[in-house]
Amino acid sequence: MDKFVIRTPRIQNSPKKKLKEKVYKQATIESLKRVVVIEDIKRWKTVLELPEQTKENLVAALQELKKKIPSREVLRSTRIGHAVNKVRRHSDPEVAGLAKEVYTEWKTFIENHLDRPSIEVHSDPKTESFRKNAQKLLSEALELKMDHLLVENIERETFHLCSRLINRPYRRTVRALVFTLKHRAEIREQVKSGTLPVGTFVQTHKK
C-alpha cells in the first residue's frame, strides 16, 4: 500500500523574524565638508557683517560655516575668514566662542593640508547678470548704494530661499520686495535700522 502513498517532507514553520530595514541617508555633494558653494559663503559673510545682527542669525550662520572648510583660495577671495575673526570679539560669549571654534578649525586644517584644494561651486555669468539687476532695483528702493551690505544681504537671502535659481519665484519675490520698500516707508526704515531682520522680511514676501 505504501507504494501508492506519496510522502512529502514536512515543512516546519520557522518563527517569523522581523528584519530591521537599514535606513540610508543619501548624501549630496554639497553636504560634504570640503565642497564649498561660493554663494553660501558670501551669504553667510553678509549675515556676519551686517550691523545690529541678531544673536540667532549669527549663531545660525556660524553653525553652517562650521560644517565647511574653505580652501585658502576661497578664504582669500571671499574674505570670510576676516569676517569670522571679527566675530570672535563679539560681546556675546556664545557667539564669540563659536566663531573661535570655526576660525581655529579652518586655520588648523589649512596649515596641515596646504596642497589639498576644496571643490568650489560657482554661479554662471547669466545668473550673476540677473542678480546684479535685482540688486540695482533693491538699492534704488532702499535709497542706498548698490554695493551696500544690506542690499547684498537681501538679494542673497532671496536667492537662497528660491533654491539658488533665477526662476519665477525669484523674480516675483524681488518685485514684491522692491514694491514694499518703495511704497511702505515704515517697513523700509525697519529694514534699514535692523529692527526687521532681513530673513524675516524676505520670507514674508516670498512668492
Swiss-Prot record:
List, alphabetically, the Pfam families matched. Med26 (PF08711)
InterPro entries, per the entry = TFIIS/CRSP70_N_sub, TFIIS/LEDGF_dom_sf, TFIIS_cen_dom, TFIIS_cen_dom_sf, TFIIS_N
Annotated SUPFAM superfamilies: Conserved domain common to transcription factors TFIIS, elongin A, CRSP70, Elongation factor TFIIS domain 2
Q: One GO term of the cellular component aspect? A: nucleus
| Entry similarity comment | Belongs to the TCEANC2 family.
Query: Which residue windows are coiled coil?
Result: none
- Where does it localize? Nucleus
Name of the protein in its database record: Transcription elongation factor A N-terminal and central domain-containing protein 2
Q: Name one GO biological process term.
A: regulation of transcription by RNA polymerase II
Q: Which domain of life is it from?
A: Eukaryota
Give the UniProt keywords, A-Z: Acetylation, Nucleus
Residue ranges annotated for the TFIIS central domain, each copy included: 130-207
| All copies of domain TFIIS N-terminal, residue ranges | 39-113
Report the transmembrane regions from the record.
Answer: none
Instruction: Please list the residues that carry the modification N-acetylmethionine.
Output: 1
